[in-house]
Amino acid sequence: MLSIQEIMALIPHRYPFLLVDRIMELEPGVRAVGEKLVSANEPYFQGHFPGNPIMPGVLILEALAQTGAVAALSAPENAGKLVLFAGIDGARFKRVVRPGDTLRLEVQLEKMRRGVGKGQARATVADQLACEAELLFALTDPSR
């Protein structure tokens, strides 16, 4: 399990854009399972949507991407690198995510070639599928 401090040591995201609260399972370079505790205080709920708060789908995808970045960057050979989003294929949203929900974020990394990788991602709430997608990412030197 990784704490928020350990997550922040791996990825550069910070409030209000750090969307993973903890990592419960980690196989470095292979897979990660994380959680986002969705609070009524999230800044995006002010406008999405007043009186009917729903977590934007793009932020669910970003939370999945950050979980995948933790999996990739926890591998010793990727230490000190930066993970950039390179694409999304087959994204599907099956359930709304609301304040009070705990979003479970699962990412399985599949391929890595010449600094470009792919992962299968799923987000669930109470064992119900909220989102699934194939995420594409690139590993790079942060000074570039």
From Swiss-Prot:
Active site positions, chain numbering: 48
Subcellular location field: Cytoplasm
The keyword Electron transport is annotated on this UniProt entry: no
Enzyme Commission identifier(s): 4.2.1.59
BP terms from Gene Ontology: fatty acid biosynthetic process; lipid A biosynthetic process
Domain of life per record: Bacteria
Endpoints of the signal sequence: none
Main location: cytoplasm
GO MF terms held by the record: (3R)-hydroxyacyl-[acyl-carrier-protein] dehydratase activity
Example of a GO cellular component annotation carried by this entry: membrane
UniProtKB keywords: Cytoplasm, Lipid A biosynthesis, Lipid biosynthesis, Lipid metabolism, Lyase
InterPro entries in UniProt: FabA_FabZ (IPR013114), FabZ (IPR010084), HotDog_dom_sf (IPR029069)
The reaction(s) this protein catalyses: a (3R)-hydroxyacyl-[ACP] = a (2E)-enoyl-[ACP] + H2O
NCBIfam families for this protein: fabZ, PRK00006.1
Role summary: Involved in unsaturated fatty acids biosynthesis. Catalyzes the dehydration of short chain beta-hydroxyacyl-ACPs and long chain saturated and unsaturated beta-hydroxyacyl-ACPs.
Family named by the database record: Belongs to the thioester dehydratase family. FabZ subfamily.
PANTHER family linked to this entry: 3-HYDROXYACYL-[ACYL-CARRIER-PROTEIN] DEHYDRATASE (PTHR30272:SF1)
Record protein name field: 3-hydroxyacyl-[acyl-carrier-protein] dehydratase FabZ
UniProt gene name: fabZ
